[in-house]
Amino acid sequence: MPRALDTGEIASVADEYRRATRHALQAGFDGVELHAASGYLPEQFLSSGTNQRTDRYGGSPENRARFIVEVLTAMIDEAGSDRTGIKISPEMGFNSVTDAAPQETYRYLVQRLSMLRLAYLHLARTRSAFDYRALARPLFNGPLLLGGGLDRDSAASLIAQRAAVFGSLYLANPDLLQRFAAGAPLDAPDRETFYSDGPRGYVDYPVLGQTLEVGQVDWRGAARA
């Protein structure tokens, strides 16, 4: 039966993020990003609709943001602030995670994140009722990234002001920048392989002109059969 973490258990969860950061660096990654979006645990702590706690991790925006700050602090201890970023998704509503006062919540959070001198703040594009990008820009003293549903043209218009992020398109097109430069067609990501085991959907997407065989499936150039 699901239950809320006891207050004394929360520090051990932050330590799990610390260990994950250490392992990522040992594996050769340049940096780490805290996924505090899409209804995952950090956003569940942050959002008033899911956080019903009455201890120091619940109630006010400051308390609800405490878990995120403590996790980031643990990650920074391992990687340094210049190699640690965060992704947030105001009002995405994914996994039914909602907040009664998102502007107040995210205003406090972004101000607090700026104090940590993170490598960047990654904003997921959402259909929010308020302009969260306009809210974040003057409050965050660092690079601001925007991602989600972008293509070459929409990303180009953003790069002059901030930075653009590609996720699933990069997964499906390991040579994405070269394809953009050449105006070449793009492979569509196979969503049925997301969060699955094995190499399919991870390392079997070809670059232009390349053919890869995985099992009995032949993947070609800019079109997946």
Language-model features and meaning:
Residues M1-A225:
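Flavin-dependent oxidoreductase catalytic cores
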